[in-house]
């Protein structure tokens, strides 16, 4: 696969910040958990939407009639929202949605991340310190004390957590699938693709719809293969989709490789460095000389925007505290 242009991070961007701005930012950081929970309630109870729908602003007494809260509770939410620049008050005492509030309410990426942090990560992140010290996903116990990693149990998560997990996982990969497929199809022209760690089969489906001659095999844990098969039960694309249950850490590829392309999308970030080295060696031994290994990963130091770098780096805390205890989103240097 082609490597994206490397956008260097600007590590000195905040070195010249004033003391006043620095302490203000510090206060925002330490109170950010409270702001986050406030935002979730405002979104979940449609309060931001009610304010947005009133183009000329809305008075407190009119807004309270639309909510489930009394004047005390609503006042708390609105006070924080104003202080955090999510909404603002005009000179007539009417509430309006700010530009920040607009994106919190309407931006799909932001809403997906909000639900993921709330339903998958938030409670578990209280165990971050223990997870970092032990290299175990101590926050996972909030779902089930006996689980060792999250992956075999995705189908067992509470509904809101399961939906949030898959929405988050799919959003940051699905947006790249078609572009990646076009590159693969035009430059490699494969006939058979192995999608290792294929999850629910979205990459496979996208490729099968794009190229009506391609064949795809999804290889994943048994729990994930069950989900994939369920998603293809109404359309097997004339037999062009196949499935195989494997645990990549213990699987021995003894059969002859029929893959022209082996596809790993947001897969290596689920493993420790020593596991990654072992996986890649095993795949290299399995591949034909003309098989091409294609890897798609979010890389923090290749991002153009600060918010993207922050999102990816914070996502690595999920891997430590919730997913497995030992993996992370990889840097350019680590991949090389």
Write out the residue ranges for each language-model feature:
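Conserved Class I S-adenosyl-L-methionine-dependent methyltransferase catalytic core
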Residues: 13-53, 66, 72-191
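Alpha-helical subdomain
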Residues: 2-91, 192-336
């Amino acid at each position: 696969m082609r490597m994206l242009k490397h956008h260097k991070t600007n590590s000195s961007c905040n070195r010249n910040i004033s003391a006043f701005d620095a302490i203000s930012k510090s206060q925002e950081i330490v109170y950010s958990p409270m702001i986050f929970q406030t935002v979730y309630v405002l979104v979940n109870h449609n309060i931001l939407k009610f304010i947005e729908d009133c183009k000329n602003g809305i008075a407190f007494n009119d807004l309270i009639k639309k909510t489930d809260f009394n004047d005390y509770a609503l006042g708390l939410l609105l006070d924080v929202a104003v202080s955090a620049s999510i909404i603002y008050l005009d000179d007539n005492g009417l509430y309006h949605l700010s530009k920040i509030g607009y994106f919190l309410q309407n931006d799909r990426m932001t809403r997906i991340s909000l639900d993921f942090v709330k339903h998958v990560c938030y409670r578990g992140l209280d165990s971050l310190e223990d997870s970092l010290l032990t290299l175990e996903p101590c926050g996972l116990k909030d779902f089930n004390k006996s689980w060792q990693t999250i992956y075999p149990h995705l189908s067992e998560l509470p509904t809101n957590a399961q939906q949030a997990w898959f929405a988050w996982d799919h959003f940051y990969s699905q947006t790249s699938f078609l572009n990646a497929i076009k590159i693969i199809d035009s430059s490699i022209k494969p006939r058979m693709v192995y999608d290792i760690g294929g999850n629910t089969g979205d990459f496979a489906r996208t490729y099968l719809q794009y190229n009506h001659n391609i064949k795809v095999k999804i290889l994943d844990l048994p729990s994930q293969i069950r989900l994939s098969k369920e998603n293809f039960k109404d359309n097997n694309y004339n037999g062009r989709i196949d499935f195989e249950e494997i645990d990549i850490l213990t699987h021995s590829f003894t059969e002859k490789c029929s893959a022209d392309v082996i596809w790993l999308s947001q897969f290596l970030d689920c493993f420790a460095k020593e596991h990654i080295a072992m996986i890649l060696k095993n795949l290299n031994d399995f591949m034909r000389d003309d098989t091409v290994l294609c890897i798609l990963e979010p890389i923090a130091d290749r991002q153009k925007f600060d918010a993207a770098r922050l999102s990816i780096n914070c996502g690595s805390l999920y891997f430590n505290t919730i997913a497995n205890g030992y993996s992370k989103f990889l840097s350019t240097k680590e991949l090389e």
